[in-house]
Amino acid sequence: MLIWAFVPYSVREGRLDGFDFDTLQSKRELADAFRSLNLAWIWQPITETNLEAVIEQVACEESVVLNLCDGIGNRGTPGPCVVRALERARIRFTGADSEFYEISTSKLAMKERMKSAGVPTPGWEALRDSSGIDGICARVGAPLLVKPDISAASGGVFLRSKVSRDDDVRALRDELTTATMPLYCDARTVFAERFIEGPEFTVFAIGNWRDPASVRCLPPVERVFNASIPEGEKFLSYERYWGLYREERPPPDGGPFYVYADCDAQVARRLEKISRDAYIAVRGRGYARVDLRMDRASGDLFVLEVNANCGLSEDDQTSTGCILKLAGMTLADLLGSSLKDAGVSL
């Protein structure tokens, strides 16, 4: 059995660009994990131009693909095309199938499905044009967070995205739909979502919605924001998330933007239940990370989004790395579970 690790790359000025994947640390982590699992593997760069040739080669062998491609399909970021090609070739693979990938790429599509399934998610309105913005703060409930429908790693979200006036919603909508966005962001559609004042959590979910009994969660963790940050700024903005400061500033005390911590046992049980429900509602398959916030006043939990094909790493500077550390797990444990779900006997 050979494991092909499909890693997303683009071709820029005649050179391969491996985004954040092509690092010595990433390769070492995978090598160590597969050594622990006693599995042979290949690091395979995937671009939109070599995809079909690689698929043809993989299909000729007894292989399984560890699919790490998580792009949104624009500007050379391979993602949905990879999943569709794997499905057409009937190759076993880890991660989201094409249905889950498509749903989870759009925050609006996720929210519609969660609402239909009775999973609590903050109120929202799509801002398809400027004509219906008057009164939105009163209808949805201020403060609002204005953000792109398609966005990863907080792309298109600023501290000033949190607003309480209709005119500010309109201005942000017009700015986002015309501005140059980060690579994993498409702001042609923008929406306004009620901002939930309170703590933030994240939960790693695994399984297949078609078999609800297979869906399980790793222990939830709280994303604890730096205490020196003003209370109203404790949310993920792009500049603070990446430490790329242009119009914003780092935490006043010079410490990290946030750290992760264990959750209270009672809260953890609630988080696992709602995360599992959200994962099933958006037709989760493979694995994903569910982001949630708790209303400080009411104690109610709300699901923000379900991130399919989230990053896999043991690095404790990453969300998954911190989750694994607090759960007492290794990357090999997580990959082994994902590969078993894909039909690999370990």
Question: What do these predicted regions represent?
Answer:
Residues M1-G14:
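Short beta-strand segments enriched in small/hydrophobic residues
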Residues M1-W4, V58-A59, I103-G198, W209-D211:
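Active-site nucleotide/adenylate-binding loops and adjacent lid/helix of ATP-dependent enzymes
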Residues Y9-V11, D70-I72, D149-S151:
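Short glycine-rich anion-binding loops that position phosphate/pyrophosphate groups of nucleotides
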Residues V11-K27:
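Glycine- and acidic-residue-enriched helix-capping/strand-helix junction motifs
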Residues L24-A126:
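Conserved N-proximal alpha/beta basic substrate-recognition cap immediately N-terminal to
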Residues T47, R188-R194, F201-T202, R283-A297:
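A short glycine-rich, hydrophobically flanked beta-strand micro-motif that places a catalytic Asp/Glu
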Residues R170-P252, D262, Q266, K273, ...:
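Phosphate-binding site of ATP-dependent enzymes
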Residues P212, P256, D262-L346:
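ATP-dependent carboxylate activation and anion-phosphoryl transfer catalytic cores
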